[in-house]
């Protein structure tokens, strides 16, 4: 663990309780003499705290230092992924986070599984996964998440995003990944959707094998940092 997340990190005094307390003082057995580095994942600062008090249910920390230390990928990557099974989205979130993806937009394509509903509770769960990933890899800012109800909405929001499909030019490392790369569901895009893409740059992955959507995401995120 590179640091501990706390939404109020930078305050002079912090109270650690609940799940964070259990993890730090019961699982990791942090001692009162040790210092802790914390982040709020918003301002890029690493805050150092000393223990003022440790009780059976909470701990009080006192701020003793702060330094700007941004840990992010050198290139920004925006993936626009059609909704797949929730469990598969959850599996790839840590990988995308570690590979420096700056934003993940989810949208319901024509062939998306409509029974997979992404509500506020699901987004909060996704964010929790990303927070744990940041703590492990050291990333200093959270990946942005958003959801669109259909393909047209996603295209309207990102008019310069390119498309990953079965046909097109080989995806180059020089592509503008910050403008967005649209990745379809397992069954690909419908014909009406392909009609929407006529004015877009179309790329393909240089493999003869058909990749699952989550594999395509990891591939694109990796190429973007080359």
Curated annotation (Swiss-Prot):
A GO biological-process term: rRNA base methylation
Location of the protein in the cell: Cytoplasm
InterPro entries reported for this sequence: Alpha/beta_knot_MTases (IPR029028), RsmE (IPR006700), RsmE_MTase_dom (IPR046886), RsmE_PUA-like (IPR046887), tRNA_m1G_MTases_N (IPR029026)
Entry keyword annotation includes Acyltransferase: no
Gene Ontology cellular-component terms listed: cytoplasm
Reactions this protein catalyses: uridine(1498) in 16S rRNA + S-adenosyl-L-methionine = N(3)-methyluridine(1498) in 16S rRNA + S-adenosyl-L-homocysteine + H(+)
Enzymatic class: transferase
Gene3D superfamilies per the UniProt record, alphabetical: 3.40.1280.10
NCBIfam families listed in its UniProt record: PRK11713.3-3, RsmE family RNA methyltransferase
Main location: cytoplasm
Family: Belongs to the RNA methyltransferase RsmE family.
Function of the protein: Specifically methylates the N3 position of the uracil ring of uridine 1498 (m3U1498) in 16S rRNA. Acts on the fully assembled 30S ribosomal subunit.
Native species: Helicobacter pylori (strain ATCC 700392 / 26695) (Campylobacter pylori)
Molecular functions (GO terms): rRNA (uridine-N3-)-methyltransferase activity
The keyword Methyltransferase is annotated on this UniProt entry: yes
Protein name as annotated: Ribosomal RNA small subunit methyltransferase E
Matches recorded under Pfam families: Methyltrans_RNA (PF04452), PUA_4 (PF20260)
E.C. designation(s): 2.1.1.193
Source taxon at top rank: Bacteria
Keyword annotations: Cytoplasm, Methyltransferase, rRNA processing, S-adenosyl-L-methionine, Transferase
